[in-house]
Amino acid sequence: MRILIKISSVICLLIITNTVYSKTIQIDFTPYETYSIEVAHIDVGETIEWLPNADHNVEFLGGPNMNYLPEKSEFNEFYSVNFDTPGVYLYHCTPHGNMGMLGLVIVGNNFNNLKDIEEIKLSPVAKSVLQKLIKISKSNL
């Protein structure tokens, strides 16, 4: 019986510890039409928060499950996404995406859907920025 209680206690402690140590990253918008963090490496279950800005928002263009992407944020509204599925997520600012205002989220260091992300139709400027962000994402491993 004591062993069962000890095992249950350890399991509860592990669950609580995992919840407590989940990380949240905050991303702001810069005056240069970029996100303050353009490539975010996070673990499964972690959260990213985008701080409010009157001129910018967040719209996901691709992810590991193209049928289920986070909803587009409103302008000047706090926006938060918890990432439970590993893979590469591409997002942009709706009015400034064609000018290269993009960001990548790499969840669980999983690049399995990178080819799908690279095939998303973008303006030439945005495509160039995406290639730069992909290089950065791979160099941060």
Model regions and ranges:
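Extracytoplasmic copper-binding redox domains, predominantly the cupredoxin/blue-copper superfamily
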Residues: 20-141
